[in-house]
């Protein structure tokens, strides 16, 4: 199943969480925080402004991004957990 986001929405796959702390302590799955970084796997066509013109998104497929811990809506596609969020929920692109 492929998800094609609409308007200014973005589909993101979370990057794998760190399973060890900086001091080397291994965290069990429940204790590890969900990462706030991900990779963009699909983008919408852009938001339509008040003038009727479509504004393309600043992010593109393949970008690594940072977003808030509670950003987006979790969806499952082909057994994989993905996030669908608006572009405004993205803090920045990791370069």
Swiss-Prot record:
Locations listed in the record: Cytoplasm
Gene3D superfamilies membership: GroES chaperonin
Pfam families: Cpn10
InterPro entries in the record: Chaperonin_GroES, Chaperonin_GroES_sf, Chaprnonin_Cpn10_CS, GroES-like_sf
GO terms of molecular function: ATP binding; metal ion binding; protein folding chaperone; protein-folding chaperone binding; unfolded protein binding
A Gene Ontology BP annotation from the UniProt entry: chaperone cofactor-dependent protein refolding
Major subcellular location class: cytoplasm
HAMAP family: CH10
Subunit organization: Heptamer of 7 subunits arranged in a ring. Interacts with the chaperonin GroEL.
UniProt protein name: Co-chaperonin GroES
């Amino acid at each position: 199943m492929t998800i094609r986001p609409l308007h200014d929405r973005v589909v993101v796959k979370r990057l794998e969480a760190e399973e060890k702390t900086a001091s080397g302590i291994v965290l069990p799955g429940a204790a590890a925080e969900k990462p706030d970084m991900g990779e963009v796997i699909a983008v919408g066509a852009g938001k339509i402004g008040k003038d009727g013109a479509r504004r393309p998104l600043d992010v593109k497929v393949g970008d690594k991004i940072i977003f808030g811990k509670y950003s987006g809506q979790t969806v499952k596609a082909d057994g994989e957990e993905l996030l669908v969020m608006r572009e405004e929920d993205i803090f920045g692109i990791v370069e």
